[in-house]
Amino acid sequence: GCGSFCCTHELEDFQFQIIQTGGSNIVYLGQELDFLADRNGLGREDVLTHELALEFGGTRALKLYQRHCGFRGLCAGCMEKPLHCRLYPFVPEFSPEGELKRLQDASIFDVTFSALGWKSPCTVKTDRAAALKLCQADPDWLAPLRHPYLMFHFASYGVIVDSYTRCLGRATSLSGLTGGAFWRAWELQYLTGKLFDWDYIRSELRCLEATYLEIYGEFR
């Protein structure tokens, strides 16, 4: 059965100094946060989140909002699950026209497991190819996610994942490490941004935003 890895991030090998475990770091989109706050009679400032902003030279920064959730999977009746949780274990990536291209792992840990060929602790993670085939067989199933605001953010995530995967493969400081030794060294590299090619990411995001603006006009 489900071991709730996505909600606890508890693994013997995780020996972090800074990254919180004993719960999950969940991410909200800006409009999502506003919607949930308004529906519950709150202002955005009342929802305890940490803003993550990436200036990439577009019309405005790419922003996400992160918070630590300590419910450990027992959140029914306590909070509304964000889209991040509802989509797990995959994030769909669409073309700007709305065609489903691929399914990305929904957490940095699962991205790392996949990139290194390690088995994920997530016991409900299905075969990616089979899941993609299932989604493509019924386009209407993902229709609510084919909004330009959502698709842009999903595609932006794909750009970041691609950069991370390449940089991880070239990280000589992590080469040959496994278990706790790997994750201790990884934490510092990850949190200091050394596992990302920021010039590539910014360039790709500028092109991506320009394409969406051409097709949809102002969308975020």
PLM region descriptions:
Residues 1-220:
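Short loop/turn segments that flank or connect secondary-structure elements
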